[in-house]
Design a protein with these regions (language model features):
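Conserved donor-binding loop and adjoining core beta-sheet/short helix segment
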Residues: 67-80, 85
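Conserved acetyl-CoA-binding loop-helix of GNAT-fold acetyltransferases
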Residues: 95-108
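A short helix-loop-beta-strand connector motif used in the catalytic cores of GNAT acetyltransferases and
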Residues: 45-55
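A short, internal acetyl-CoA/4′-phosphopantetheine-binding micro-motif in the GNAT/acyltransferase core
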Residues: 87-94
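Conserved GNAT-fold acetyl-CoA-binding loop/helix
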Residues: 21-43
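Short acidic/polar active-site loop segments enriched in Thr and Asp
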Residues: 116
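Conserved beta-strand in the GNAT
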Residues: 56, 62-71, 88
């Protein structure tokens, strides 16, 4: 079996990402309307100044997890920080330490974005 790969989401992944979001909502017992999600995610993830960043976990050509985060500014600390909106792994991919690897990758990306 191939090791899962953590990478930035690509436009070609948007349908799979929306499907993962639906699974995430089901897990949280929340409503999730898939209408226009691909279009809206495309707008916010792939603009010249993205308002959202997303890492996905790919295994054997299929997305098995994702995390979404944003660069924010703290008035109190007068510095930038990363706000992680969510982290979700499919049920069969949990328990293998992938979440910890995702957190390490977010820390790396936070430094690149000039966040504490």
């Amino acid at each position: 079996m191939n090791e899962p790969k953590i990478r930035f989401v690509q436009k070609k992944d948007l349908l799979q990402l929306v499907n993962l979001c639906k699974l995430h909502a089901d897990y949280e017992k929340a409503d999730y309307d898939v209408q226009q999600k691909e279009e809206l995610l495309n707008k916010h993830l792939f603009s010249d100044h993205p308002s959202l960043y997303c890492l996905v976990v790919e295994k054997e050509g299929r997305l098995i997890g994702y995390t979404a985060y944003m660069k924010q500014f703290s008035t109190w600390d007068a510095t930038n920080y990363i706000y992680m909106d969510c982290l979700f792994m499919t049920e069969e991919s949990r328990g293998f330490g992938i979440g910890e690897k995702i957190m390490d990758k977010i820390k790396e990306e936070a430094q690149k974005l000039g966040c504490a």
